């Protein structure tokens, strides 16, 4: 009886270990891109995520990308080839997606469904889809691989009104829309960051020079903070697969939890 019990425990332990995500992929723009810019003055949160988890982070975020260009120009095709069963893919866009397809070669078509607009970019005809369509496409391909897509709202700009961070653009809501439709995890990254910035205060962030070049791109310290906000989301929302891969350093990340208004 004791031997059978021990064998069962060992099998459960082996199963648990095998089920823990070993790879995290990131699809996104410069706010997540970990390659750094502006002579090291700025960086993205994807560079620091691996400091808090035991899984390997594969950061495919590319500066300047929108959901449309990430799909069109091959960045997504490269990422999805590497994804395996049990992996997680973090998907975050919204900063470069503004503007319609005719006025911006990065902009999506209007709407939330299967609407399309055909445009010509640099002499090449392109069928442009809606922003949610691209996110659904990415997420469904991840699911087909036996992996888990996790969508995040975009990061806030350094913009204050009476000591508060304004509400996010429509792209944050689009991420929540796709999350609800496909029943996949959603972290309101914007909300975690914004509410915790407000606790710190605008003056503190200015003193720290967290936005050394513009209102969008973070210093390394601020990018690390944004990575911590991803960890906060994982903890606050008790995303079990990801809680299981948090390391000791993640234990030092203790910020208030905030319910998403989306």
What residue ranges belong to the model's regions?
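Fungal secretory targeting signals
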Residues: 1-18
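Serine-esterase "nucleophile elbow" of acetyl-processing enzymes
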Residues: 17-62, 77-89, 105-112
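Glycine-centered flexibility sites
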Residues: 28, 44, 61-64, 94, ...
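Short, solvent-exposed coil/turn elements at secondary-structure transition points
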Residues: 30, 63-65, 155, 192
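Short, solvent-exposed loop/turn segments at secondary-structure boundaries
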Residues: 36-40, 70-72, 161-166
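N-terminal post-signal-peptidase region of extra-cytosolic proteins
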Residues: 67-78
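Alpha-helical cap/lid subdomain in secreted, periplasmic
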Residues: 78-220, 224, 228-247
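A short, charged, Gly/Pro-tolerant segment at domain boundaries
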Residues: 246-262
